[in-house]
């Protein structure tokens, strides 16, 4: 799973290094969650903190950004949340005569569950809802799934593409409201993993 911001120079992407705060970062006895606040090590005009919230007993991780605009002009940006995977099929497994699926999938209320074969991405024939205000995007392998779960009602753009020899991205882009000078904006989504 990868995440980052787009739309301006100096904004962190999925390769940006972050610093942890000093001291232990643990889920305390009796606590329901722990919040990790990671500070991006690059950027002077824009300060970015990645906020990860882990909840006891949950497979859902909240992933968010706090973006402080230190410039004298409004900042327009988007956040992306994606999965990177090779296109090799997982070992062949057949259950009751049915082969399992490996690849990206999108779910929306309107179009339901849409599995996409890596070959269809290669050939430009991938069929999935590119824009929606509900649903999720996942990477599926056999019985395992990881999914980005954007907030319901938030317009998002789903994408899938080949990025190299047998390497693929599947992700979702969500808007961040324009951030005025010297103000802080926030964006978040959830990761099921």
Which functions belong to the PLM regions below?
Residues 1-193:
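Soluble non-transmembrane domains of integral membrane proteins
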């Amino acid at each position: 799973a990868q995440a980052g911001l787009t739309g301006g120079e100096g904004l962190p992407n999925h390769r940006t290094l972050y610093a942890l705060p000093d001291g232990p970062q643990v889920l305390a006895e009796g606590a329901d969650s722990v919040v990790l606040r990671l500070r991006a090590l690059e950027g002077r005009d824009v300060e970015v903190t990645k906020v990860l919230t882990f909840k006891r007993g949950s497979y859902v991780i909240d992933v968010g950004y706090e973006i402080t605009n230190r410039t004298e002009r409004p900042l327009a940006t988007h956040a992306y949340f994606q999965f990177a995977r090779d296109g090799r099929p997982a070992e062949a497994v057949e259950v009751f005569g049915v082969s399992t699926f490996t690849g990206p999938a999108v779910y929306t209320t309107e179009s339901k569950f849409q599995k996409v074969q890596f070959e269809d991405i290669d050939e430009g024939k991938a069929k999935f809802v590119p824009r929606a205000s509900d649903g999720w995007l996942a990477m599926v392998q056999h019985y395992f799934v990881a999914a980005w779960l954007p907030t319901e009602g938030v317009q998002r753009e789903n994408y899938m593409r080949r990025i190299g020899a047998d390497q693929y991205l599947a992700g979702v882009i969500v808007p961040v409201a324009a951030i005025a000078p010297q103000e802080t904006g926030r964006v978040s989504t959830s990761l099921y993993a």
